[in-house]
Structure formats: structure tokens, C-alpha cells
Amino acid sequence: MPETEKPLFGHPWIFIRGVPSLNFLPPEGPLEVAFAGRSNVGKSSLINALVGQKGLARTSNTPGRTQELNYFVPDGYSGESGDMPPMAIVDMPGYGYAQAPKEQVDKWTKLVFDYLRGRATLKRVYVLIDSRHGIKKNDDDVLDLLDKAAVSYQIVLTKTDKIKAPAVPKLLAETAEKIRKRPAAYPGVLSTSSEKGDGLDDLRQAIGETVGVARWK
């Protein structure tokens, strides 16, 4: 793997744009990893913990707050040819919010599917699953969509500090078995706690390996 001048997660990240429709997508440049999950799965909190910046991705107690594809990149790059950031993180709209109007849900669904299907620089989607609830029907629907689009994805359990520690290995094994036959699923399942910091280095390393950057911290 090539070395990069700066570690992926050892310096500040910045928000570059929100994408309400494909017309607003940035030009394809650095490799991208995306984060998907049900509303209030802790997606924004995990991104903030991952980069060590509390206010980067906006968190909210209101489900369905993220309605766009939100792009984040490491700071310190001009974005011009020869000075591109090594990667981008894409925070995807949360799904499964029962109170969202159907028109809004349809809009999110189209945006997400079009992005997944047509983004050549997208290397992997990290699908976040609340460790207290496991894989639910809406999650299965998203995994079906990713399998259909042939987009590589990896399951990341969140909020493991909310369950008893001895339950985590069992949950990891059960989750791995549930996705074993899915064609686009990466076999390793990760567990994380944004609150305690557990598993964050494992996720950072996984992302570094995915985008081909050896120096991730």
C-alpha cells in the first residue's frame, strides 16, 4: 500500500458539501466510503468519533435529520490535480424513519440507489446496525439493494456500550452468519462504541485498507 504524507485520521477533517440530488455530486476524484444505517443508529456520532471531531457530522435526537449525502474529506488538500485528498467519507440519509412523509422517503431512496449504482469511486459502504436491536427488516432491504447493485459493504455494530460485554462476541458471530451467503458482503463484522471509543481503531484500519492507505493514524 502506498504511504500518504499525512495519516488519514491524525488531522482535521472538513465538510465539503451536502448533496440533495445527483446533480450536486462532486466530480469523481478521491476514493469514497459511505456510512448507511437506520435513523438514530448513531451514524453521525460514529463519524465524529472516527475522526476525533465532535461537531463534524451534525447529530440530532430527531430521526431522519440527515436528508442529503454529506461529504467529508481530510483538510489540507487543494482538491486540484496532484493534491487530492486520499479519500472522502459520505454520510448517507438514515432509513427506516416511520414518521417521514412517503414523498421524502421516495426521494431519499432514489438518491441513495442512484448514488450506489453509478459512483465508480465508491469502494465500500459501512452499514451500521444498532447492537441492541440487530438486523431488522429495513436493514435487510438495504443489504438486498447493495447486493443487487454489487456494491461491497461491511456490517458495523454500534452502541456496544449499551449491551453487556459478554454478549458482543456472540452477536458478532450471529451477525456474520446472517450475512454469510450475501454476495456483496465483506465477511468481517466490526463492533464499535462512539461513547467509549471501543473498536474505532479497527474501523479506521479497515477503512485505510479499503482505500489503499497504509498510514491511517
UniProtKB/Swiss-Prot annotation:
InterPro entries: G_ENGB_dom (IPR030393), GTP-bd (IPR006073), GTP-bd_ribosome_bio_YsxC (IPR019987), P-loop_NTPase (IPR027417). Keywords: Cell cycle, Cell division, GTP-binding, Magnesium, Metal-binding, Nucleotide-binding, Septation. GO terms for biological process: division septum assembly. Coiled coil: none annotated. CDD domains: YihA_EngB. Mg(2+) binds at S44, T66. The keyword Nucleotide-binding applies. GO terms for cellular component: cytosol. Its cofactor is Mg(2+). Residues 29-213 form the EngB-type G domain. NCBIfam families: GTPase_YsxC. Belongs to the TRAFAC class TrmE-Era-EngA-EngB-Septin-like GTPase superfamily. EngB GTPase family. Necessary for normal cell division and for the maintenance of normal septation. This is Probable GTP-binding protein EngB.
